[in-house]
Amino acid sequence: MHILVACDQNYYDKWAYNLLKSIHDLNPHDWLQLHCHVVNPDKLNKLDYVDYTTEQYDYVTIPYLQGVRFVVAAKKFKNKEHVMILDADSICTREFTKEEFINVTSDVTVLKHHKKNAVHPWLCGFVTLGTELFRQDYANNLLITKTHKWEYGHDQDILLLLSNLHQYKEAPQEWICMGKQNPKSVFLTLKGDKHKNNPKYTDQLKRYIVQ
């Protein structure tokens, strides 16, 4: 059973490193494997309990960094494996059980935008891959467009497109909250620049950083 994040070196240092530490600190389970894919690493400060993959890529853009994790997941994990993918700018706030993890990852579970008329109603901040063909469909549809031509929101455009083919379950509040911390939630994510650049939100995340 697996949790995957992907980012560049800057985002790893600023966000992903603390996310991975927080997950392991609260959930040092032998059944849970943590994975991090880093694009263009430079002096990577690795954690012993994390499985790392890296790549060198000349055309790094925000859209590429947003979508590459789903391409990595399709290559790395077999369809029957239980996989959760998170935004790097998240933090773990409580323990979860193996049964809870299996339950949420058995289906394609996705973070839902709180606004009904949002351009992207399904958000990539929290995605579980289910145990069927979703991960392959997602990666293949992302790659129909050459990676250096990906535009902002490409990952969520494809996520929306596939909602007609795969039945998504809305990520429950018990697993993920966005911006404002909820004591019930396993993860808090700062999805969006509005939250990442506002101390009102970042200070909530900092409370869970493991020193």
Regions found by a protein language model. Give the residues of each.
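N-terminal anchoring/stem segment of glycosyltransferases
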Residues: 1-59, 78-79, 188-201, 206-211
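Aromatic-acidic/polar surface patches that form glycan- and anion
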Residues: 9-16, 62-66, 117, 122, ...
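GT-A fold catalytic core of metal-dependent nucleotide-sugar glycosyltransferases
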Residues: 65-116
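Amphipathic alpha-helical segments that form well-ordered structural scaffolds
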Residues: 22-26, 72, 155-162
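Short, solvent-exposed loop/turn segments at secondary-structure junctions
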Residues: 9-11, 39-42, 90-92, 114-116, ...
